[in-house]
């Protein structure tokens, strides 16, 4: 395969041909990225922010063109392209414009006035170097630009490998960054399928950030382990929605439809398991089915549910539907498929032996299951190998937040769905087999750098008390010194019984408070971590 034909899932139209990146070219790109990274990392964080900030105007000035390119490449409706792809990037950039310099600032760390009387300690943040961002097809703009932008702010160069299903969006991204005042080669991309992704990892970037399915995530991790290269994995979910009997059922049913069928269910935090308390199950299901009948599905750019992006994913949805029906599930209707248009379906009379309740569906199926009490709800929700996101619905916020604390997930929301993933200040990521690593928030920015710790000793003495030579008396003095520092009775009592040890250490200026005060002016130039 030398080229990839980009075809729109909307109507099959050809969007362009893209040349597949060869291993030799990828290696050349990595070399170029390393040169750019050396220049970029030397810039202060404030200067990096300044050079990346014009991206905001580029996005705002080209909203219609961006949304249309995303719509043609993915099949999602225009509003979802705007709110699910462009808005989160704008908000993330605005968040880091204000906070990145402080988040990445050198931090002072307290030192013991006894063991380190003449020393200061600090933690610096350094960029990895070259980051490979391997992004998915469901949100090809947001899930490419968010890690790309974060990696750049942290001081790295980036090579993007977008999904082969959405190459026009990848081209759009590199074109946008080409308009910025960045070192040549700081943002590059490679073109191809999974094999190209493997070749990118074999070129040995310094960090790999992958978003996608569990199976591919394992392959990425195995490939990176050969070298070894650190990885961050944002994988799938089998996300739950718990509706308690005291919930606002009208709001909750509307949220369930949106949470399950937004982007045709192709969202890592889609509602894929809906548990409703038995006392309100029948009423809630009736409201759900009524709302389902009103959804506008198809090619309308201003409809509710667009088309699915991947034919292979449609086959998985079909298999999950057929398995559930074969095991006795009831459905709101048949799984109607017209090209890449798949009609959303609600399922009930389901159980955890069905694929639709255990495996990630990533499509417009919503299984609904009753529970008797809170304990059963938590047990059902946690009965999964995945742990990405969840929501709890109740008018008793204290109760809902208490239950949220029992969920094995990386993220949760009370009385809302999906929206928490778009909060730029909240670190997002999963637990269990939903991956590890975070993006968004301070944690997300820190994850694209590594800590370097430093200790500066300004003592003018010829030696430290712990240096050679050792002696028996020295051992006894150290014992007394440790008892004085860490003993749990009063300092006066500890001082009386350890007078000999304390006297022995005076020659080493253990209590040289003058030097300690001299170090304070250095501490005020950094931020403290405690």
UniProtKB/Swiss-Prot annotation:
Gene3D superfamilies: Aldehyde Dehydrogenase, Chain A, domain 1, Aldehyde Dehydrogenase, Chain A, domain 2. GO terms for molecular function: oxidoreductase activity, acting on the aldehyde or oxo group of donors, NAD or NADP as acceptor. Keywords: Carotenoid biosynthesis, Oxidoreductase. Involved in the biosynthesis of C30 carotenoids. Catalyzes the oxidation of 4,4'-diapolycopene-4,4'-dial to yield 4,4'-diapolycopene-4,4'-dioic acid. Also able to catalyze the oxidation of 4,4'-diapolycopen-4-al to yield 4,4'-diapolycopen-4-oic acid. Pathway: Carotenoid biosynthesis. PANTHER family: ALDEHYDE DEHYDROGENASE-RELATED. This is 4,4'-diapolycopene aldehyde oxidase. It catalyses: all-trans-4,4'-diapolycopen-4-al + A + H2O = all-trans-4,4'-diapolycopen-4-oate + AH2 + H(+); all-trans-4,4'-diapolycopene-4,4'-dial + 2 A + 2 H2O = all-trans-4,4'-diapolycopene-4,4'-dioate + 2 AH2 + 2 H(+). The active site is at residues 234, 268. Coiled coil: none annotated. It is an enzyme of class 1 (oxidoreductase). The gene is ald.
């Amino acid at each position: 395969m030398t080229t990839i034909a980009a075809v729109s899932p909307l109507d099959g139209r050809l969007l362009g041909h893209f040349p597949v990146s060869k291993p030799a070219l990828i290696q050349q790109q990595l070399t170029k990225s390393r040169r750019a990274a050396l220049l970029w990392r030397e810039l202060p964080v404030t200067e990096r922010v300044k050079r990346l900030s014009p991206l905001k105007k580029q996005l705002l000035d080209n909203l219609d063109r961006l949304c249309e390119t995303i719509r043609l490449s993915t099949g999602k409706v225009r509003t979802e392209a705007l709110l699910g792809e462009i808005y989160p990037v704008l908000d993330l950039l605005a968040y880091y414009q204000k906070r990145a310099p402080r988040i990445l600032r050198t931090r002072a760390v307290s030192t013991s006035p006894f063991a380190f009387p003449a020393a200061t300690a600090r933690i610096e943040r350094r960029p990895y170097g070259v980051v490979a961002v391997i992004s998915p097809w469901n949100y090809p703009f947001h899930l490419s630009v968010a890690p790309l932008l974060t990696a750049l702010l942290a001081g790295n160069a980036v090579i993007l490998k977008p999904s082969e299903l959405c190459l026009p969006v990848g081209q759009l991204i590199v074109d946008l960054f080409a308009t910025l005042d960045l070192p040549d080669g700081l943002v590059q991309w490679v073109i191809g399928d999974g094999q190209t992704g493997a070749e990118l990892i074999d070129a040995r970037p310094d960090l790999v950030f992958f978003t996608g399915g569990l199976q591919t995530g394992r392959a990425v991790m195995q490939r990176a382990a050969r070298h070894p290269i650190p990885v961050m994995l944002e994988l799938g979910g089998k996300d739950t929605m718990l509706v308690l009997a005291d919930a606002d059922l009208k709001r909750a049913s509307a949220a369930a439809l949106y949470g399950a069928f937004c982007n045709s269910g192709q969202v890592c935090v889609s509602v894929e398991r809906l548990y409703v308390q038995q006392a309100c199950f029948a009423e809630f299901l009736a409201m759900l089915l009524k709302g389902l009948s009103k959804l506008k599905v198809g090619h309308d750019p201003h409809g509710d549910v667009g088309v699915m992006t991947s034919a292979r994913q449609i086959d998985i949805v079909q298999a999950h539907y057929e398995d559930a029906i074969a095991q006795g599930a009831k459905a709101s209707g048949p799984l109607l498929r017209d090209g890449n248009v798949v009609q959303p379906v609600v399922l009930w009379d389901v159980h955890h032996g069905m694929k639709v309740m255990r495996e990630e569906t990533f499509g417009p199926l919503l299984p609904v299951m009753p529970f008797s009490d809170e304990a059963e709800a938590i047990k059902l929700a946690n009965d999964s190998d995945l742990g990405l996101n969840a929501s709890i619905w109740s008018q008793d916020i204290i109760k809902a937040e208490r239950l949220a604390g029992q969920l094995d997930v990386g993220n949760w929301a009370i009385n809302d769905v999906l929206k928490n993933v778009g909060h730029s200040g909240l670190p997002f990521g999963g637990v269990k087999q939903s991956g590890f690593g975070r993006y968004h928030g301070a944690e997300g920015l820190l994850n694209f750098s590594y800590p370097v710790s430093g200790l500066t000793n300004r003592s003018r003495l010829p030696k430290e008390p712990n240096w050679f030579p050792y002696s028996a008396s020295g051992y006894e003095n150290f014992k007394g010194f440790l008892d004085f520092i860490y003993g749990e009775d009063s300092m006066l009592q500890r001082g009386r019984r350890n007078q000999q040890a304390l006297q022995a250490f005076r020659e080493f200026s253990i209590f040289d408070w003058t030097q300690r005060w001299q170090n304070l002016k250095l501490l005020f130039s950094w931020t403290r971590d405690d």
